[in-house]
A protein has these predicted regions:
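Catalytic core of Fe(II)/2-oxoglutarate
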Residues: 1-2, 11-127
Length: 127
């Protein structure tokens, strides 16, 4: 079970206006969806971000990536894995929050749900 995510940003030519920021959302227990954007992290070169990955850890890109040709958002992700705690429910895969213009799109919400399902994620990805 993932316990922590560590993301290290490797691009030294990204500018704030290029987007690609990491967003961390609170969880809405009534809808089981992301509720409020709590933290937004600019992807600066050599910056490391550590965040927990509970069953309700929503993360994604609140500012869509928009880079000129030749510039890309590069990062390295490391996961700290542990045996599941007895008192915790089994963690599914990563929970990605939809963009503001996607949050009412049932197709996008279904894709996020399928992508997070540890048993059926292969129906979404080409493996």
């Amino acid at each position: 079970q993932r316990w922590w995510n560590i993301i290290v940003y490797l691009s030294d030519d990204l500018q704030p206006e290029h987007g690609g920021h990491l967003g961390l959302w609170s969880h809405d227990p009534e809808t089981n969806l992301p509720k409020e954007l709590k933290v937004e992290v600019e992807p600066k070169f050599n910056r490391a971000v550590i965040f927990d990955t509970t069953q309700n850890s929503w993360h994604g890109l609140p500012i869509e990536l928009n880079t000129p040709k030749g510039i890309c958002r590069q990062s390295m992700a490391v996961y700290y894995l542990t045996e599941p705690r007895i008192e915790s429910c089994l963690r599914q895969r990563a929970l990605f929050a939809p963009h503001e213009n996607q949050k009412d799109n049932p197709e996008v919400l279904d894709l996020i749900k399928k992508r997070a399902d540890s048993q059926n994620y292969s129906s979404v990805y080409r493996i």
